[in-house]
């Protein structure tokens, strides 16, 4: 990394030097059973314990010499002038689907009154309950304000924010600022926009943009993997479509970030396998975790770029052989989540046994609860850093989902 390139990520396994997290906040306490599906949750984590688990995760990374950054802090540091701060508030409000002009005005006044930038950022993440707003005089209400909904929020919370992998993805020295699958999560990308536009270190054009949140097709960071300095992997999944991948790849190749080929993985389109990194992660030079249930239906395409055109070939051979050839290793070991036991594989994949964070070649952060997968990984010679995640896992994401590398050593 240099002063001109504050982002440097050319692998999934190079020694991790700097990483972005988001400590779960009050947005988690704004989950309620009636609206879990709307907010893309299956259950409600207990915030106090989720924070303890997340703090332990962050400390485990620090203990390995990794600098931990926080999304909420970088976003606050990006509001460098009163004008930028006000522009952020107005853009946040314009994307918040607020019902009623008077309600929007009341929320703007509430946010403008918050003096501390980090408190402001955390409030925008938490959402706004209608009960927090002053009673609006009938004479000021528009029709939308008068037709009162029983929905308790004036602005939805963003409970998925602790999965920092998805709103944007670091690729080489650039960043893909994503357009996300759902309206609920697409608002999360606003923080990345302000960080990479205005932050003293990461803003001001220092980081090339290879995808923009204003695109109309969807892509999420869980489907963007950097296998080596030459090869990327992308998932065509429930959350990422092929049109987005084509746009991303053209931009990456045109901006000369150094990548020569992309492997596009097409697999089952459902919540259980929402991203590529929930079923497939790299843990060493020649080792990957994989969920066995995707192997039969998996299709892989090789994509290269020449004469300003993408060239796409469907790969017909064995996946392990394909990966070995593209990574320049003799053989690749695909380590099955849950081993060969169908029940264990299903249970441990649901609990993110395949969603590992590699912090150095062969050194992997995992949830301790996935005992069968962990035992297999250890039998393959991998060093595991095991963290508790009984509350964090309720959001359906593991250590890779909860982290966004900003700097890795080259391999």
Swiss-Prot record:
List, alphabetically, the SUPFAM superfamilies matched.
Pentein
What GO molecular function annotation could you give as one example from this UniProt entry?
A: arginine deiminase activity
For the keyword Membrane, the answer is no
| Catalytic activity reported | L-arginine + H2O = L-citrulline + NH4(+)
Q: Name one GO biological process term.
A: arginine deiminase pathway
Spell out the post-translational modification annotation for this entry: Glycosylated.
Q: What is its main location?
A: cytoplasm
Q: In which pathway does it act?
A: Amino-acid degradation; L-arginine degradation via ADI pathway; carbamoyl phosphate from L-arginine: step 1/2
Which keywords does the record carry? Answer: Arginine metabolism, Cytoplasm, Glycoprotein, Hydrolase
Active-site residues (renumbered):
401 (amidino-cysteine intermediate)
The record's Gene Ontology cellular component field reads: cytoplasm
Q: Which InterPro entries match?
A: Arg_deiminase (IPR003876)
Compartments, as annotated in UniProt: Cytoplasm
Per the similarity annotation, which family is this? Answer: Belongs to the arginine deiminase family.
Which protein is depicted? Arginine deiminase
Q: Which organism is it from?
A: Streptococcus pyogenes serotype M3 (strain ATCC BAA-595 / MGAS315)
Classification lineage? Bacteria, Bacillati, Bacillota, Bacilli, Lactobacillales
The encoding gene is arcA
């Amino acid at each position: 990394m240099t002063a001109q390139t504050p982002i440097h990520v050319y692998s999934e396994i190079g020694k991790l030097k700097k990483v972005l997290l988001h400590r779960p906040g009050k947005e988690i306490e704004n989950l309620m059973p009636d609206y879990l599906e709307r907010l893309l949750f299956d259950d409600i984590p207990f915030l106090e314990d989720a924070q303890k688990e997340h703090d332990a995760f962050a400390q485990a990374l620090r203990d390995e010499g990794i600098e931990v950054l926080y999304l909420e802090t970088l976003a606050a540091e990006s509001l460098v002038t009163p004008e930028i701060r006000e522009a952020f508030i107005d853009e946040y409000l314009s994307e918040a689907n607020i019902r009623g002009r008077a309600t929007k005005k009341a929320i703007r006044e509430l946010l403008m009154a918050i003096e501390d930038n980090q408190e402001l950022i955390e409030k925008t993440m938490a959402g706004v309950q209608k009960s927090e707003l002053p009673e609006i005089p009938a004479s000021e209400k528009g029709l939308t304000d008068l037709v009162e909904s029983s929905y308790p929020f004036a602005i939805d919370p963003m409970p998925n924010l602790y999965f920092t992998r998805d709103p944007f993805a670091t690729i080489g020295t650039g960043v893909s600022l994503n357009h996300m699958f759902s309206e609920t999560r697409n608002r999360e990308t606003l923080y990345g926009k302000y960080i990479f536009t205005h932050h003293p270190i990461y803003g001001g054009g220092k980081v090339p943009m290879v995808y923009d949140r204003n695109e109309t097709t969807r892509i999420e960071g869980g489907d963007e993997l950097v296998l080596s300095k030459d090869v990327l992997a992308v998932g065509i999944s429930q959350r990422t479509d092929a049109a987005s991948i084509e746009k991303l790849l053209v931009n990456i190749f045109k901006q000369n970030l150094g990548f020569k080929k992309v492997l596009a993985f097409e697999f089952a389109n459902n919540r259980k396998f929402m991203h590529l990194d929930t079923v497939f992660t790299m843990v060493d030079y020649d080792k990957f975790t994989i969920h066995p249930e995707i192997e039969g239906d998996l299709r892989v395409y090789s994509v290269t770029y020449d004469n300003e055109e993408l060239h796409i070939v469907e790969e017909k051979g064995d996946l392990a052989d394909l990966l070995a050839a593209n990574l320049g290793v003799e053989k690749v070991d695909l380590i099955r989540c849950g081993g060969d036991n169908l029940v264990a594989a299903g249970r441990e994949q649901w609990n993110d046994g395949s969603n590992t964070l590699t912090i150095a070649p062969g050194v992997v952060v995992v949830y301790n609860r996935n005992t069968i997968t962990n035992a297999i990984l250890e039998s393959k010679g991998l060093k595991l850093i095991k963290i508790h995640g009984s509350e964090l896992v309720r959001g359906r994401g593991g250590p890779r989902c909860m982290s966004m590398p900003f700097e890795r050593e080259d391999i």
